[in-house]
C-alpha cells in the first residue's frame, strides 16, 4: 500500500516538473502580444485554454508568458522558423 502511494506521488511530481513554460505564439510564429504588463486577464485566459493546458499566464516583455503548458503547445521561438514566416 505504501509503495502504491509513493509511486503515485512520484508520477504527480514528474508531471509537474515536466510541464513547460514559455511565450505563446500566433499563427505567424511571433509572440502573442500584450500591453498591460504583469497580471493580465487576456494572457491568463489564453494560457488556460483547454488545448494549451497552461496553469497560469501573464504579460512579460509585451508577450503572453505561460506556465505549466502541455508539451504539444508551441512556444516562442519556434525552431527553424522566424517570426513572420521568413
Curated annotation (Swiss-Prot):
Tissues/organs with expression: Expressed by the venom gland.
Biological process, per Gene Ontology: defense response
Domain LCN-type CS-alpha/beta: 20-84
InterPro entries: LCN-type_CS_alpha_beta_dom, Scorpion_toxin-like, Scorpion_toxin-like_sf, Scorpion_toxinL, Scorpion_toxinL/defensin
Assigned protein family: Belongs to the long (4 C-C) scorpion toxin superfamily. Sodium channel inhibitor family. Beta subfamily.
Function statement: Beta toxins bind voltage-independently at site-4 of sodium channels (Nav) and shift the voltage of activation toward more negative potentials thereby affecting sodium channel activation and promoting spontaneous and repetitive firing.
UniProt-recorded name of the protein: Toxin CngtIV
Species whose genome carries this gene: Centruroides noxius
Amino acid at each position: 500500500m505504501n509503495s502504491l502511494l509513493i509511486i503515485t506521488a512520484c508520477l504527480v511530481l514528474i508531471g509537474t516538473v515536466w510541464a513547460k513554460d514559455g511565450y505563446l505564439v500566433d499563427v505567424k510564429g511571433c509572440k502573442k502580444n500584450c500591453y498591460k504588463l504583469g497580471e493580465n486577464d487576456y494572457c491568463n485566459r489564453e494560457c488556460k485554454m483547454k488545448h494549451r493546458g497552461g496553469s497560469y499566464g501573464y504579460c512579460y516583455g509585451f508577450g503572453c508568458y505561460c506556465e505549466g503548458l502541455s508539451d504539444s503547445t508551441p512556444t516562442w521561438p519556434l525552431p527553424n522558423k522566424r517570426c513572420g514566416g521568413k
